[in-house]
C-alpha cells in the first residue's frame, strides 16, 4: 500500500539530500507513482476514510503528513513512499479539513503548553542540512508528539468533531514549528537535566515528531541516538491508533547511500555515546531510505501477507488509542545515556498473527473503547504533559488490550537509552501513576529501547510465510524495490514487504480478551510495574528488539496479504500498526499461515523499523527485509546468512541493489565453513520461500488458547501445536539452531539462524522475548536472557555467545557500542571456547570480522535479512527436511566477515518433558530437539556444577541455566569491553539471583526424581513432526567436558535420531557430520557405564548407568540377592562417589529393599552407611535419611553419632518443624539401641530443638534419655560391689541402725550395674528386717528403713515397689508370730507411704509365692486382730475385694479364709449397727463376685435376714429395701415376715413404688395366696391377716385385672365382690382379730387415691364378710391410675 503524500505545504519542505536518496533508492513499481505526490495522499485518504471513518484518522493523517514533510525532502520522501508502499495506501493519511480544524482547535492549548516544554528540551538541527543517515536516527518532533497526543486524547474521548479541529490546529502548529530555527533538544530536568545538542544539522528540517517514531512523551524528553545504524526505534506504527507498541527491531541496520550519511551516523553515534543521548531525530525519509536499502527484507515479510490484515486492523485500533491517549498526564522524563544504545538487547518478540482478523478488529474496537477505563499504558503515555513513554513500557504495559501495546513506547524506550538505574527509579515513580504504566520508561522499557537501538532487523525479524498467492502478489508489488516511501503527510507507511516495515504479531482472534493481548509473558511482566524491573529490563532490552524485528517482518507479510485481501489500505495500515504493538507480547501465537524465519542468525543489521506516524498505518506493518518480493523469499535468508564479504552482492536483481556483506551480517555467528559456502553460493533469483499450508486450523486453536488466558505456558503452547501443522511444512523448513522456548526464547544473542519453518510459530516465540521473560513473566525467574547482548558473556549463558547483528554490526571498534555487547556485568568478553569432540574451539570476538554499518552506509549497501529456514539457501536433506546450521565444531575463520554465531539458546521455556536423571540433564546438551521436545536446557559448568531439571518452572530459560552453568567458564577477554552498559550492575545482580534460584529450583525438582525420570515423556514432547528442533546448545561457546559431551544428546527421543542423518546431509563439512554421527552413536548405542562390575544376573542399566533401566519389564534383577552384600556395598560406594541425586535415591531403594529381606553380613561396611547418609543430607533428602536410619536400627547397625548430630543440625537450619517428631523418635530409638551421647551432645541437641521451636514434650523426651544415660554412666563408675554392700548391711543389722541401712539401700540403688544384683541386695534387706524377732524392742526396723528411703529426693516407683515387697515380708513375718501390733505398724507405714502392697508379693520366703488373696487376708486379719475394723475394711477395699480371678488366682483355702474373715468382720460391724458396711462385706462374700467360685450362696441367708431384720427394726427402709432386692436377685432365701413388714413399712411411709415392687415380688415368691383364679370372676379373696397396705395392693390388682369389664358401658350393674377370708388358724384367733381385719379393709379403701367405696353385702356360709366394691369409685380410680397401674400389675418385672 502506498503512503499518501504529505498534504499541503508539508510536501515541499524536505531536505534535498533526502530527496536525492529517495530518487536513488526508488525503483518504480506497480502503484509506485502515488507514493509521493499529494494525489497519492488523496487516494490514500479516501481509502482511509472508508476504513477509518470512526477513527478520526484523516485529521491525524494530515498532522502526521506535516511531520513527515519536515522530516524528509519532498521528492525523496515521495519516491521512498512510492517504492516502499507500492500501491499501499495508508488509510490514516486521508485528511478531512473539518477534522483538522477541530483537532487544531482542541489541541491549541495543549500544543502551546507542550510546545513550551519541548522548546526547553529540544533543539532542532537546522533544516538545511539533509542527513540521509538519519534513517537510523529518529528525531522526536515536538509538534507531532503534541498533535499525536492530542489526537489520541480526543479519540479516546470519542469526539470526532473536536479531533478534526484539533488536527487543523496541530497542522498549523507543526508548520510553525518547521519554520522555527533549529531547536536544541534537551532532556527535561526531570530526566536529570541531560542536555543534548545534535552535532550536525542532520535534524534541522526533520519534523519534530517524524514518522510517529516516538510517542509524544518521547519527543519531549529525549532524542534517540542509533548506534551502528542498527536501531531504528519505531515508536508508533502508521496510525498508532491503538498505540500498539511496534516492537522495532532495534537492530535493524539502516544503511544510507551517501557517505555523508555514514559520517552523520558516526557523529551521531559518537555524540550519543558522549552525551548518552540516543538521537531520535530520524526523518521518515531516512527510514524509507533504509527500507530501500533493505529491499530484501520486504520479501521476508511478503510471506506475511495474511498477517498484514491483522496488523492493519491493529493499526486502526492503535490510531484510535493514540488519539484517546492524548491529554494524559505527562510522563516523567527519562535520562538517556549512550549506554542505552550499547545495552540494547535483542528482543525477538514472539509474533502471533491472530487467526481472525475480523475478530482482531473487534478486539481492537473493544480495546479502544476500554482504553480510557483501563488506563492503558498508551493512554498514560499519550498524556498531554508530554511524559516520555518508553517503547518497552508500552510493550511491558501492554495492557489488557492490543491498544495498550504501542510500539511507540517501545521505540521510545529504544530511543531513550537511559541508564537502568534512572529507569528503575522512574519506573518506580511511575508505578504511582494511574496504571503504574505511565512510568513506562522503566528499566525494562529502556532495556527494550536499548535492544532496539543496537539491533539489525535481520537479527530480529522473524518472518512468516503467508500463502503462496499472497507471497506472489506481495513479491510482485515489491518486485522493483523495497524502498521505504515516506508519504509527504509525514506518516511512515512502508510497502507491505518493504525493509522498513515492522511486522507486528497480531492476535487474530477477536475473542481475545484485552488481557490476552498480553502475550503470556508480557502480561505478567508488563503489568507488574511494582515488580523489580531490573529483572525484566534485560528481557525488555531483548524483547523490545526482538519484538521490533518480528513485528517488522510480520507486519510486512500481514500488511501485504491484507493489501491484497482488502483494497482499502486503511485497514492495512491500521492493522499493521496494531500488529507491531502486539509484538511486545512475550509468546505471541504466531499465525500458522506465516512462517517465522529465524533471521537472527543472519540479522545483518538490515533491520528496518517502520517509522509509523500517527496517520500512517502501514508503518507498523513491517520492515521488509527484501527488496524484490519474488526473489526476496529465499534471498533474504541467503543474504543475511551469507552476506559476509564486503563485496556488494546483488540482492535485488531487478533493483540492481548490492548487498554489502560486511555490513549485512551484524550478528556475528559462527558458521560452518561449508554452510557459509552454501549460503553464499548462487544468486537469490530462484529463491522461494516455502509456504505453510493448512495450518490455519491448528494455529487457530493455539490462538484461541492464548486468547483465553493471560499467561501462556510455553509448554502449553508447544503442546497445542500438534505435529500436523509441522508435518505439512517440515520439508521446506530449516531447523533452527536454537531451541525454541515457546514464550521467552530470547535468542538474540544465541540467535540461531535457521529455524524449521514448521517451527515458525515457535521461532517467533523463540526470537520474541517479552519483558515478562524475567521473573515478572510466567513464574520465570529473572534471567538475563541470551537474547540480551550482555548475556552473551556476562550472563555466561551456556548455550553460546551469539553476537547479535547489532553487536558486531559495526567495526570491531564499535563493538563496545553495540547493544548486543552491553553485557549486564560489564565483563570483558573473553574468547569463548568450546570443546567439540575433544577439540577446543576458541575465537576471540574481537578477532571476528564485523561488518561496518557506517561503511555500509557509505557504500550505499542494502542490508538484507535472510530467512534462515529457507531450503533454497541452506539446502534440503534427502528427506526434504531443511538442513540446519548445527553446532559448528569450529569457527569459520576463513571468512572474517561472518561474525561467529554462538547459539546461546535461551529457551527459558523449553522444559524437557524428559524424565531425566539430574546428572543426565547436567551433562547432556540436547543438540537436536525432535518434534516439539521441550527440554530444560541442561547445561553444565566446566566445573561440572550440574543443573537439575526444573520442570516445575516453566519459565526456566536456558539463559538462566546458562548463567549458572557458565559462571565458572573462563571466557576470553574481548578486545574491547562494553563501555556503556546501563545493565551492568543490575543485570549482574539479576544473573546471580537467577543462577541461585535456578540452582535451588532445579535441585528441588531433581532431588525427587529417579534415574528413570530422565526418560523423555513422549506425551509432553509431542513429537508431532520429526522435524529436529534447533540445537538446544551449541558446542562452540561451551566449555564441555568429555563427560558432558557424551551425554549431550541424552535428552533426545528415539525419534530424534531418525532425523540426524537427514540433517547431516546438509553439511558438507566432514567434521561436522562426524560430530553429529558421534552424538547419534552415543544416543543409539549405550548409556555411559559407571564402571561397576555387576554380576550378569543383575540389570547393568539399573546398577551401572546414570539413567537406570528404562525397560518396563526387565528380566534382570534390580535388587541384589542374599549373599551379594558385597555388590550392594560396591554400588553404594560408586553412587556416593558420583554423588548424583538420582543415584543416591537409587541407593536408598536398593538399601531398603535388600536389608528388609536380609540381615547385614560380613561385607556390611558401617562407613558406607555413614557416607550414604551424609550424601543424602547434602542433597536434602531427609525422608530417605529417616528411612535408612530406621532400618539400620532394626538391623542393629547404628550410624555414627556425628550423623545423628548432622541430622539435628540440618533440621534446625532448615527450620523443618514437621520433621522434629520423627527425629525425636529416631533419637530415642538410637539411645535405646545403645548409642552413647555425652552431656554436651544432649545440650547441643536441646539447643537445636529450641532453635527449631520444638515442643516442650519433645525436649522433655530428650532430657529423659539424658537422665537414663547418666544413670547408666553412674553405674559404670560405681565402686562399691554387692559384697561390700552386704557387709555393710550386716553391720547395720548388728548395730540396729536401720536409718543407715536405708542410706545404704539408696547408694546401692544408684550404683548397681545389674538389676539382679539390686534384687539380691533388697532380699537381704528384707531378711535382715525380719530376723530381729528375738529383739523385744518396740521399734519396727522396717518402719525406720522405709522412712529413710522415702525421704530420698530421687525416690521413684521402683523404690515404692521395693519397700512394699519388703513390707509384705515383714507383715507376714509378724503374722506368723501373731505380733498383730507390729504387723499393724508395718501396714500403717505402707498406708502412710501410699504403697499399694495388696498387689505386691514378698521378697523372701513363702510370701514370694503367696497369692494376692492370701496377702490381703493376712493384712485384714492383722487389722482385725489388732481391733481395727476400718483397717480391715481398708485392706479389703484396697484389694478391690478380689478373691480369685484369672489374673490373681488363689486356692480354696484362701477362699475359705476369706469367707470366715468376712463373716467375722460382718458380725462385728453389724453389732455396731453399721448396716451399710455390713451389707458391703456381705456382698463381697465368696460366690458373689466370680461365677467360677463354687460356693453356695444360700448359706448366707442367715446373715442377710439378720441384716434385713436389723434394718427393718431400725427403720432403715432404704437399706432394708436394698438388702431385700439383693437377696431376691441372688436367690437368697428371705424371711416372708421380714418382707411383709418391709412392704407394710414402705406403704405406710408412702413409698408406694418400692412397696408395690416388693409386693409383686412377694406374690411371685408365694408370700401371698395366688389371685389368678378369682380375679376374673369378679371375686377377690383377701386374707384377714394382711395389713391395710397389703389389702389395698390386692384391691388394686383386682381392679386392674377387671378393668375391661368395669369400664365397659353395659357392666355398671355388675358387682365386684370382696371376701375377707378367714385363715385356717383363725379359729384359734379371737373374733377381735377378724374385726380388726374388717377395719383394715375399710381403711385400705379410704387410703386409696381416689378413695374407694366398699359396701357390706352379706356374710357367707363360712361366716366371712362379703363386701362389694362400688362401680363408680372403681371406674374413677381406673381412669386416674390405669396408666401406671397397668404397667405395674399387668406386666412382670422378671
Curated annotation (Swiss-Prot):
Residues 603-627 have a biased composition (Polar residues). The keyword Membrane does not apply. Coiled coil: none annotated. Residues 31-40 have a biased composition (Gly residues). Pfam families: Asp_Glu_race_2 (PF14669). GO terms for biological process: cell differentiation; spermatocyte division. This is Protein TOPAZ1.
Amino acid at each position: 500500500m502506498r503512503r499518501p503524500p504529505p498534504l499541503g505545504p508539508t510536501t515541499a519542505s524536505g531536505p534535498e539530500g533526502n530527496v536525492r536518496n529517495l530518487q536513488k533508492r526508488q525503483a518504480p513499481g506497480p502503484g509506485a507513482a502515488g507514493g509521493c505526490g499529494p494525489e497519492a495522499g488523496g487516494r490514500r485518504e479516501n481509502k482511509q476514510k472508508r476504513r477509518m471513518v470512526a477513527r478520526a484518522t484523516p485529521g491525524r493523517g494530515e498532522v502526521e503528513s506535516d511531520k513527515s514533510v519536515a522530516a524528509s525532502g519532498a521528492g525523496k520522501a515521495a519516491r521512498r513512499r512510492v517504492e516502499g508502499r507500492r500501491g499501499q495506501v495508508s488509510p490514516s493519511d486521508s485528511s478531512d479539513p473539518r477534522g483538522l480544524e477541530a483537532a487544531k482547535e482542541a489541541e491549541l492549548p495543549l500544543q502551546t503548553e507542550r510546545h513550551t516544554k519541548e522548546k526547553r528540551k529540544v533543539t532542532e538541527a537546522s533544516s538545511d542540512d539533509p542527513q540521509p543517515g538519519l534513517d537510523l536516527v529518529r528525531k522526536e518532533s515536538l509538534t507531532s508528539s503534541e498533535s499525536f497526543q492530542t489526537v489520541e486524547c480526543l479519540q479516546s474521548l470519542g469526539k470526532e468533531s473536536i479531533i478534526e479541529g484539533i488536527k487543523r490546529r496541530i497542522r498549523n502548529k507543526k508548520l510553525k514549528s518547521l519554520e522555527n530555527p533549529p531547536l536544541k533538544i534537551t532532556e527535561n530536568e526531570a530526566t536529570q537535566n541531560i542536555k543534548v545538542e545534535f552535532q550536525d544539522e542532520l535534524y534541522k528540517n526533520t519534523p519534530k515528531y517524524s514518522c510517529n517514531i516516538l510517542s509524544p512523551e518521547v519527543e519531549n524528553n529525549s532524542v534517540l541516538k542509533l548506534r551502528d545504524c542498527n536501531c531504528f526505534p519505531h515508536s508508533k506504527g502508521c496510525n498508532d491508533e491503538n498505540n500498539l507498541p511496534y516492537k522495532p527491531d532495534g537492530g535493524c541496520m539502516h544503511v544510507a547511500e551517501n557517505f555523508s550519511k555514514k559520517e552523520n551516523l558516526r557523529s551521531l553515534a559518537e555524540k550519543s555515546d558522549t552525551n548518552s543521548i540516543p538521537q531520535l531525530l530520524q526523518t521518515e525519509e531516512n527510514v524509507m531510505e533504509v527500507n530501500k536499502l533493505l529491499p530484501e527484507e520486504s520479501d521476508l515479510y511478503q510471506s506475511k501477507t495474511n498477517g498484514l490484515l491483522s496488523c492493519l486492523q491493529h493499526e486502526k485500533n492503535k490510531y484510535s488509542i493514540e488519539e484517546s491517549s492524548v491529554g494524559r498526564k505527562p510522563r516523567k522524563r527519562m535520562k538517556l545515556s549512550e549506554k542505552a544504545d550499547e545495552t540494547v538487547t535483542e528482543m525477538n518478540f514472539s509474533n502471533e498473527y491472530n487467526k481472525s482478523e475480523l475478530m482482531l478488529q473487534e478486539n481492537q474496537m473493544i480495546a479502544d473503547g476500554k482504553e480510557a477505563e483501563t488506563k492503558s499504558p498508551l493512554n498514560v503515555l499519550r498524556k498531554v504533559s508530554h511524559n516520555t513513554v518508553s517503547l518497552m513500557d508500552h510493550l511491558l504495559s501492554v495492557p489488557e488490550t492490543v491498544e495498550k501495546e504501542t510500539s511507540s513506547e517501545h521505540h521510545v524506550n529504544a530511543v531513550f537509552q537511559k541508564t537502568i538505574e534512572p529507569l528503575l527509579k522512574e519506573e518506580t515513580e511511575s508505578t504511582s501513576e494511574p496504571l503504574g504504566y505511565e512510568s513506562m520508561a522503566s528499566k525494562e522499557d529502556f532495556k527494550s529501547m536499548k535492544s532496539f537501538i543496537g539491533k539489525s532487523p535481520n537479527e530480529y525479524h522473524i518472518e512468516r510465510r503467508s500463502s503462496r498467492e499472497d507471497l506472489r502478489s506481495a513479491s510482485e508489488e515489491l518486485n522493483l524495490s523495497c524502498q521505504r516511501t515516506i508519504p509527504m503527510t509525514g506518516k511512515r507507511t512502508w510497502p507491505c514487504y518493504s525493509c522498513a516495515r515492522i511486522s507486528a504479531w497480531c492476535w487474530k482472534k477477536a475473542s481475545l480478551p484485552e488481557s490476552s493481548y498480553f502475550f503470556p509473558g508480557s502480561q505478567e511482566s508488563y503489568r507488574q510495574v511494582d515488580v523489580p524491573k531490573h529483572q525484566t529490563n534485560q528481557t525488555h532490552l531483548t524483547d523490545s528488539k526482538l519484538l521490533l524485528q518480528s513485528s517488522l517482518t510480520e507486519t510486512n507479510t500481514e500488511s501485504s496479504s491484507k493489501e491484497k485481501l482488502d483494497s482499502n489500505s486503511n485497514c492495512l495500515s491500521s492493522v499493521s500498526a496494531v500488529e507491531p504493538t502486539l509484538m511486545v507480547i512475550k509468546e505471541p501465537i504466531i499465525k500458522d499461515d506465516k512462517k517465522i524465519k529465524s533471521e537472527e542468525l543472519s540479522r545483518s543489521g538490515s533491520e528496518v523499523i517502520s517509522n509509523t506516524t500517527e496517520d500512517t498505518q502501514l508503518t507498523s506493518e513491517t520492515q521488509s527485509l527484501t527488496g524484490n518480493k519474488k526473489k526476496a523469499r529465499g534471498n533474504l535468508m541467503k543474504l543475511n546468512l551469507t552476506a559476509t564479504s564486503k563485496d556488494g552482492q546483488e540482492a535485488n536483481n531487478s533493483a540492481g541493489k548490492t548487498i554489502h556483506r560486511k555490513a549485512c551480517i551484524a550478528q556475528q555467528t559462527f558458521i560452518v565453513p561449508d554452510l557459509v559456502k552454501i549460503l553464499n553460493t548462487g544468486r537469490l533469483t530462484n529463491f522461494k520461500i516455502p509456504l505453510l499450508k493448512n495450518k490455519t486450523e491448528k494455529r487457530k486453536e493455539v490462538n484461541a488458547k492464548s486468547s483465553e488466558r493471560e499467561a501462556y505456558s510455553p509448554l502449553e503452547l508447544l503442546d497445542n501445536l500438534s505435529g500436523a501443522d509441522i508435518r505439512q511444512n517440515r520439508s521446506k523448513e530449516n531447523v533452527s539452531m536454537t531451541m525454541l522456548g515457546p514464550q521467552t526464547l530470547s535468542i538474540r544473542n544465541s540467535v540461531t539462524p535457521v529455524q524449521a519453518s514448521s517451527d515458525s510459530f515457535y521461532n517467533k516465540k523463540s526470537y520474541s522475548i517479552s519483558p515478562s521473560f524475567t521473573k515478572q513473566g510466567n513464574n520465570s525467574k529473572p534471567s538475563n536472557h541470551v537474547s540480551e547482548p550482555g548475556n552473551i558473556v556476562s550472563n555466561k549463558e551456556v548455550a553460546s555467545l551469539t553476537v547479535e547483528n547489532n553487536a558486531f554490526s559495526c567495526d570491531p571498534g564499535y563493538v563496545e557500542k553495540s547493544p548486543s555487547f552491553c553485557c549486564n556485568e560489564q565483563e570483558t568478553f573473553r574468547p569463548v571456547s568450546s570443546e567439540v569432540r575433544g577439540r577446543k574451539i576458541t575465537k576471540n570476538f574481537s578477532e571476528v570480522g564485523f561488518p561496518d554499518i557506517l561503511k555500509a552506509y557509505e557504500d550505499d549497501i542494502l542490508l538484507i535479512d535472510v530467512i534462515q529456514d529457507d531450503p533454497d539457501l541452506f539446502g534440503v536433506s534427502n528427506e526434504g527436511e531443511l538442513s540446519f546450521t548445527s553446532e559448528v565444531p569450529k569457527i569459520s575463520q576463513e571468512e572474517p566477515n561472518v561474525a561467529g554465531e554462538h547459539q546461546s539458546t535461551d529457551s527459558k521455556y523449553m522444559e524437557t518433558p524428559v524424565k531425566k536423571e539430574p546428572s543426565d540433564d547436567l551433562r547432556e546438551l540436547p543438540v537436536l530437539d525432535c518434534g516439539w521436545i521441550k527440554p530444560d536446557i541442561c547445561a553444565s559448568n566446566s566445573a561440572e556444577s550440574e543443573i537439575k531439571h526444573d520442570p516445575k518452572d516453566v519459565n526456566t530459560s536456558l539463559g538462566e541455566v546458562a548463567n549458572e552453568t557458565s559462571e565458572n567458564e573462563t571466557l576470553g577477554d574481548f578486545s574491547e569491553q562494553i563501555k556503556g552498559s546501563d545493565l551492568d550492575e543490575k543485570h549482574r545482580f539479576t544473573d546471580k539471583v537467577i543462577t541461585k534460584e535456578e540452582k535451588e529450583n532445579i535441585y528441588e525438582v531433581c532431588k525427587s526424581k529417579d534415574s528413570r525420570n530422565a526418560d523423555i515423556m513422549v506425551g509432553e514432547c509431542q513429537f508431532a513432526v520429526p522435524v529436529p528442533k534447533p540445537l538446544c546448545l551449541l558446542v562452540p561457546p561451551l566449555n564441555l567436558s568429555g563427560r558432558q559431551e557424551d551425554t549431550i544428546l541424552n535428552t533426545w527421543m528415539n525419534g530424534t535420531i531418525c532425523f540426524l542423518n537427514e540433517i547431516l546431509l546438509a553439511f558438507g563439512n566432514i567434521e561436522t557430520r562426524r560430530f553429529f554421527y558421534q552424538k547419534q552413536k552415543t544416543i543409539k548405542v549405550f548409556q555411559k557405564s559407571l564402571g561397576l562390575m555387576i554380576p550378569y544376573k543383575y540389570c547393568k542399566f539399573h546398577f551401572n548407568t546414570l539413567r537406570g533401566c528404562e525397560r518396563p519389564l526387565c528380566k534382570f534383577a534390580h535388587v541384589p540377592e542374599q549373599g551379594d552384600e558385597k555388590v550392594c556395598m560396591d554400588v553404594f560406594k560408586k553412587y556416593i562417589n558420583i554423588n548424583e541425586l538420582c543415584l543416591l535415591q537409587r541407593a536408598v531403594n536398593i538399601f531398603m529393599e535388600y536389608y528388609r529381606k536380609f540381615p547385614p553380613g560380613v561385607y556390611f561396611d558401617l562407613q558406607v552407611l555413614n557416607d550414604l547418609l551424609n550424601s543424602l543430607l547434602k542433597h536434602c533428602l531427609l525422608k530417605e535419611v529417616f528411612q535408612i536410619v530406621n532400618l539400620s536400627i532394626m538391623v542393629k547397625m547404628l550410624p555414627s553419632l556425628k550423623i545423628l548430630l548432622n541430622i539435628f543440625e540440618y533440621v534446625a537450619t532448615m527450620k523443618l518443624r514437621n520433621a522434629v517428631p520423627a527425629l525425636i523418635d529416631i533419637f530415642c530409638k538410637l539411645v535405646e539401641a545403645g548409642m552413647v551421647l555425652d552431656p554436651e551432645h544432649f545440650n547441643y541437641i536441646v539447643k537445636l530443638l529450641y532453635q527449631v521451636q520444638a515442643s516442650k514434650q519433645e525436649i522433655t523426651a530428650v532430657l529423659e534419655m539424658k537422665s537414663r544415660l547418666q544413670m547408666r554412666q553412674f553405674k559404670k563408675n560405681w565402686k562399691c560391689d554387692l559384697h561390700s554392700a552386704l557387709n555393710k548391711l550386716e553391720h547395720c543389722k548388728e548395730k540396729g541402725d536401720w536409718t543407715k541401712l536405708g542410706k545404704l539401700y539408696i547408694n546401692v540403688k544408684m550404683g548397681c550395674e545389674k538389676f539382679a544384683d539390686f534384687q539380691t541386695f533388697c532380699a537381704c534387706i528384707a531378711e535382715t528386717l525380719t530376723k530381729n524377732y528375738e529383739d523385744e524392742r518396740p521399734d519396727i526396723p522396717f518402719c525406720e528403713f522405709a522412712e529413710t528411703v522415702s525421704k530420698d529426693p530421687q525416690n521413684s516407683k521402683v523404690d515404692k515397689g521395693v519397700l512394699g515387697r519388703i513390707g509384705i515380708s515383714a507383715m507376714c513375718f509378724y503374722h506368723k508370730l501373731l505380733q498383730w501390733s507390729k504387723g499393724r505398724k508395718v501396714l500403717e507405714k505402707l498406708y502412710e507411704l501410699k504403697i499399694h502392697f495388696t498387689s505386691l508379693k514378698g521378697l523372701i520366703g513363702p510370701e514370694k509365692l503367696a497369692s494376692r488373696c492370701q496377702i490381703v487376708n493376712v493384712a485384714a486379719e492383722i487389722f482385725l486382730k489388732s481391733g481395727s475394723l476400718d483397717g480391715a475394711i481398708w485392706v479389703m477395699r484396697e484389694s478391690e475385694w478380689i478373691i480369685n480371678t484369672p489374673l490373681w488366682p488363689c486356692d480354696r483355702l484362701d477362699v475359705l479364709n476369706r469367707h470366715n474373715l468376712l463373716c467375722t468382720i460382718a458380725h462385728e460391724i453389724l453389732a455396731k449397727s453399721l448396716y451399710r458396711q455390713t451389707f458391703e462385706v456381705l456382698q463381697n462374700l465368696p460366690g458373689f463376685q466370680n461365677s467360677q467360685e463354687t460356693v453356695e450362696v444360700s448359706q448366707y441367708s442367715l446373715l442377710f435376714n439378720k441384716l434385713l431384720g436389723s434394718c427393718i427394726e431400725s427403720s432403715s427402709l432404704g437399706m432394708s429395701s436394698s438388702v431385700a432386692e439383693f437377696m431376691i436377685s441372688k436367690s437368697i432365701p428371705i424371711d416372708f415376715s421380714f418382707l411383709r413388714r418391709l412392704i407394710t413399712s414402705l406403704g405406710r411411709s408412702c413409698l408406694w413404688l418400692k412397696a408395690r415392687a416388693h409386693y409383686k415380688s412377694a406374690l411371685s415368691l408365694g408370700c401371698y395366696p395366688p389371685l389368678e383364679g378369682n380375679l376374673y370372676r369378679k371375686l377377690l379373696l383377701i386374707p384377714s391377716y394382711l395389713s391395710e397396705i397389703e389389702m389395698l395392693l390386692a384391691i388394686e390388682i383386682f381392679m386392674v385385672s377387671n378393668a375391661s369389664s368395669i369400664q365397659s358401658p353395659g357392666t355398671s350393674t355388675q358387682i365386684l365382690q370382696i371376701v375377707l377370708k378367714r385363715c385356717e388358724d383363725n379359729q384359734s384367733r379371737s373374733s377381735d382379730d377378724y374385726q380388726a381385719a374388717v377395719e383394715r379393709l375399710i381403711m385400705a379403701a379410704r387410703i386409696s387415691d381416689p378413695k374407694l367405696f366398699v359396701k357390706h353385702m352379706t356374710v357367707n356360709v363360712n361366716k366371712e364378710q362379703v363386701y362389694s366394691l362400688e362401680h363408680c369409685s372403681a371406674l374413677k380410680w381406673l381412669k386416674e391410675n390405669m396408666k401406671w397401674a397397668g404397667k405395674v400389675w399387668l406386666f412382670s418385672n422378671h
